[in-house]
């Protein structure tokens, strides 16, 4: 076959309809190719199943979706994308587990036969009984045992050592130390946002006895506006004198580096969707007039957001500005906290043993 015939054959194949090319490729599919496709589909199903049952991956995917939606649309349509996220991707959208697909472990409940004669202790809504806490602690110890056995088995396999099955559980001292640190971590996080309980302390004029009365003994309602970030965890770890460098660097990768790798155009909302979330009516901005009339040198953004005279567009701009300033301040604070811990660890004391010695004067005292 001449070169001219080969070129004409190639051109004929290129000009052929795509349907004919696909149909021809299907005819040449071998049994090995089918097995490969079957294995690939099984692998994808397995990955999708692990994605559905992995809590951390589920929450991080939800965070990425919100972050990238804002990043791709907030420059020109901040109000619209903000309303879209609030109405379509609510906080309960990321709740876990999904009762329709995953069984709730219910660590706050304990099912057992109660002997007759013991009264059932009622628990207030939002409270957890001591028995439920003990049950949750036992489940935590089981998880710690599993992780401990995993690392021991890996180390034994690498060094060709046989382990005693009865000695694979994590020592009580280590597990107790881990639980104490977790209690301290959560207690510190709770103290940052908890409402302080007030007491009225008075002294009786006749008996000189001191009486303490609780001012507000009504049940507290959960504040759903409070949200924790990795800054709170890293900050609390530094307060506990823990080395949070690795966690801090990993957090920067998850929440700063990885979102920047995605292309924004893939997450831009169509105009048909954005039109549904336009402002109800166009009104003139009152923000400049409000700022010009005030006598204060500094006005908190939170105070401006509560002003009913501002339009939705003005409030959206202030919310975006407040979010950016808050994130920047939190990033700086967390960085200096981690850096301060490292400086304390590497700091060499200026005092030596000779500084503790006192030189006595010569002669008789």
UniProtKB/Swiss-Prot annotation:
InterPro entries: Rrn9_dom. It holds the Pfam family RRN9. It is found in: Nucleus, Nucleolus. GO terms for biological process: nucleolar large rRNA transcription by RNA polymerase I; positive regulation of transcription by RNA polymerase I. The keyword Transcription regulation applies. Keywords: Nucleus, Transcription, Transcription regulation. GO terms for cellular component: nucleolus; nucleus; RNA polymerase I upstream activating factor complex. Its main location: nucleus. GO terms for molecular function: RNA polymerase I general transcription initiation factor activity; TBP-class protein binding. Component of the UAF (upstream activation factor) complex which consists of UAF30, RRN5, RRN9, RRN10, and histones H3 and H4. Interacts with SPT15 and RRN7. Component of the UAF (upstream activation factor) complex which interacts with the upstream element of the RNA polymerase I promoter and forms a stable preinitiation complex. Together with SPT15/TBP UAF seems to stimulate basal transcription to a fully activated level. Belongs to the RRN9 family. This is RNA polymerase I-specific transcription initiation factor RRN9. It comes from Saccharomyces cerevisiae (strain ATCC 204508 / S288c).
């Amino acid at each position: 076959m001449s070169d001219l015939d080969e070129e004409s054959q190639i051109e004929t194949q290129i000009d052929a309809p795509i349907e004919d090319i696909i149909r021809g490729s299907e005819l040449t599919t071998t049994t090995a190719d089918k097995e490969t496709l079957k294995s690939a589909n099984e692998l994808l199903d397995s990955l999708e199943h692990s994605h559905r049952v992995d809590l951390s991956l589920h929450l991080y995917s939800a965070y990425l979706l919100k972050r990238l939606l804002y990043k791709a649309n907030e420059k020109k349509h901040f109000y619209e994308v903000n309303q879209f996220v609030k109405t379509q991707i609510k906080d309960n959208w990321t709740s876990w587990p999904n009762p329709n697909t995953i069984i709730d472990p219910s660590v706050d409940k304990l099912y057992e036969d109660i002997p007759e004669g013991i009264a059932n202790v009622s628990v207030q809504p939002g409270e957890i009984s001591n028995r439920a806490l003990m049950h949750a602690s036992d489940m935590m110890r089981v998880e710690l045992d599993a992780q401990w056995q995993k690392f021991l088995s890996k180390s034994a396999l690498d060094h060709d050592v046989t382990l005693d099955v009865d000695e694979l559980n994590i020592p009580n001292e280590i597990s107790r130390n881990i639980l104490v640190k977790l209690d301290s971590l959560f207690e510190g996080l709770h103290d940052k946002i908890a409402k302080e309980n007030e007491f009225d302390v008075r002294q009786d004029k006749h008996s000189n006895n001191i009486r303490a009365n609780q001012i507000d003994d009504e049940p507290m309602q959960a504040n759903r506006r409070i949200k924790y970030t990795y800054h709170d965890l890293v900050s609390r770890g530094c307060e506990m004198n823990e080395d949070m460098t690795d966690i801090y660097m990993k957090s920067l990768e998850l929440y700063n580096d990885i979102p920047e790798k995605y292309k924004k155009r893939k997450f831009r909302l169509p105009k048909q969707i954005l039109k549904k979330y336009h402002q109800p009516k166009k009104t003139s901005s009152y923000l400049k007039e409000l700022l010009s009339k005030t006598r204060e040198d500094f006005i908190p953004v939170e105070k401006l957001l509560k002003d009913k005279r501002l339009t939705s567009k003005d409030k959206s701009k202030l919310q975006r500005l407040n979010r950016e300033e808050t994130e920047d301040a939190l990033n700086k604070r967390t960085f200096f906290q981690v850096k301060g811990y490292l400086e304390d660890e590497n700091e060499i004391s200026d005092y030596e043993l000779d500084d503790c010695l006192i030189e006595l004067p010569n002669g008789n005292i």
